[in-house]
A protein has these predicted regions:
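Structural motif
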Residues: 3, 30, 96-98, 118
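Helix-adjacent hinge/juxtasegments
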Residues: 50-99
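Active-site metal-binding loops of divalent metal-dependent hydrolases
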Residues: 7-10, 35-37, 58-61, 103-105, ...
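Conserved beta-sheet core of the metallophosphoesterase superfamily
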Residues: 54, 97, 103-166
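N-terminal active-site segment of His-dependent metallophosphoesterases
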Residues: 1-52, 68-76, 86, 168
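Residue-level marker for the onset of beta-strands and adjacent loop->beta junctions
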Residues: 42, 86-87, 126, 151
């Protein structure tokens, strides 16, 4: 299964549309969002994805109540709060144990525990990936293009491989 991973929309709906089209072209079946919708209208658009979406809040998600309300009508949209993937909110996609947080300073220690197969984070607006034992730590970069080239990522659960992709 292919998972599309994105972060830091910062209300850039044009780039979000590009990201969603790219995910469709690449055959993504589920999405992981690592925080910073910023406004409810960005969350609303992401909630229109045709498959499951796993999402967390970021530091720039000001009106969390409004964001929660606009995604509440989509039973396939799972908004975990600050992080997802612990024992109470286990995220397993195609047998891969996943943790999602906005913050890399939490994600890297979580990746080092060995409890997860993949840990995804955002916040820095810089795409990166590294391995800690058998666990992948991946930051897809930013959709918004605020600090550089907009990027997203794909994760293939069958191959346990990932790819960073630039948006045009």
């Amino acid at each position: 299964m292919i998972i599309g991973i994105l972060s830091d929309i910062h209300d850039n709906l044009n780039k979000l549309e590009q990201a969603l089209r790219l995910f469709e072209e690449k055959g993504a079946q589920e999405l992981v969002f690592c925080g910073d919708f910023c406004s409810p209208f960005s969350a609303r658009r992401l909630a229109q994805w045709n498959g499951p979406v796993h999402a967390v809040f970021g530091n720039n998600d000001g009106d969390r109540f409004a964001i929660s309300r606009v995604v509440a009508d989509n039973p396939k949209f799972r908004l975990y709060g600050e992080y997802g993937g612990d024992e109470q909110q286990l995220i397993s996609i195609d047998g891969i144990r996943i943790c999602i947080t906005h913050y890399p300073f939490y994600a890297v220690p979580l990746a080092r525990t060995g409890w997860f197969d993949a840990v995804f984070a955002g916040h820095t607006h810089k795409a990166e990936k590294q391995r800690f034992g058998s666990c992948l730590f991946l930051n897809p970069g930013e959709v918004a293009g605020v600090f550089g080239t907009p990027t997203v990522a794909l994760y293939d659960t069958a191959l346990r491989s990932s790819e960073l992709l630039e948006l045009g």
